Amino acid sequence: MVARNEIFWADLGPPAGRRPVCVITRDAAATVLTAVTCAPITRTIRGIRSEVPLGPDEGLPEQCVIKCDNIVTVPVEALDRGPVGQLGEIKRSELDRALRYALDILY
């Protein structure tokens, strides 16, 4: 089962390849869909508002960021069998803010 705010390794195909992603599909939908919306995670850190910094506390081997400007829909079968980590409460709030910024959602 896949849940929002979990981090999985996924095969995104070319050019992104295999990389970690953070699931952003809501839980009620993620349990029944064959594909979920994810934000890719990258080691390229630009320090912009649409990024969420991550690291070992979230199950990743080094410092990196969730890149909310490049969200993608990924077939569930492209995700590894289990998550490598998940976001804590503070990172979940940061992700929500970064997504609102990236998608220009004002409220």
Each language-model region and where it sits:
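Short coil-to-beta transition motif at edge beta-strands of beta-rich domains
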Residues: 1-10
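Residue-level detector of alpha-helix boundaries and kinks
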Residues: 5-6, 53, 80, 84
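Short hydrophobic/aromatic-rich motifs at helix boundaries and adjacent loops
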Residues: 10, 22-23, 71
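Generic anion/oxyanion-binding catalytic loop in active/binding sites
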Residues: 10, 27, 84
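Compact nucleic-acid interaction/catalytic patches
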Residues: 16-56
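C-terminal terminal-subdomain/extension
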Residues: 59-107
